[in-house]
Amino acid sequence: MNKLIAPFFIIISLFITACNSDDNENEPMSPFSLEKTYYEVRLWRSITEIPITNGSGDISLSVADETIIEANKVQNEGGSTYVALQGKQKGTTTLTLTDNVTGDKETVEVKVTDCYIAYGIAESNHPTLTSNLMLYLVNNKARDCYFFTMDNMRHQLNNTPLAEGTYEFFVKQNGEETVPYLRLSYSADPSGNFAQNAPMEIHDFALSFSDSQAVLEIIKSYLDVDWVELISNATTKSVPPRDYTMILTVPETDYEIIGAFATASIPEYILN
């Protein structure tokens, strides 16, 4: 009797497996679509990702102007797929993504902006540059900078900058000590607070670092700042981990701002 039961269960299990396989094959594939049709990528120094979350995952890419961006399909070890965009020169072009199985197409506009870097303030007793403020320094001829606040309800930056200004890095010689400075120019009222209709004022901040080599390298790389006097002894070796903390102090005051550089993206439609 037992000899008859065992083959019976084997046949049943094979039948169920075959049915499940047929069900998976007959399950309709979700159409291919994207959440956004507009993307920005900074010039050369970073990659913007377009996540592929539906469709077959078998995607073909066609860039209208390959002198502006480079686009590549990337598949992670976990199986997730995305398109990596890298900016080659400033400008705007389109990228068409085609699902080779479903035939669905999506065309997105891609804008390459000036390179920039973010400085996020973690702690501060400064009246204007307060904690949770994000400062973006742009690598353009004007040396523009933008100040953004956080939308705590949505846990993201507000889309419109709180203020705009310009920046400059320079060095002061204090006896035998060389001190780097960041000069920020922005409109401020008599108390030093941001004010749109007020005249531009210059604010100088002395800089200190937890890891001077790492910070000076990232500033030089993203903003083309020449720190010859400060990095003359820097090596080209990788020294992990790297700490991008930078401390700003206002000379002859007790104001101290502690933050760190990051490659966080600026809200869209801000930069040219």
Model-derived regions, located:
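Sec-dependent signal peptide recognition
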Residues: N2-I10
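C-terminal motif of bacterial Sec signal peptides marking the signal peptidase cleavage site
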Residues: F15-A18
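Extracytoplasmic soluble-region selector
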Residues: N20-L271
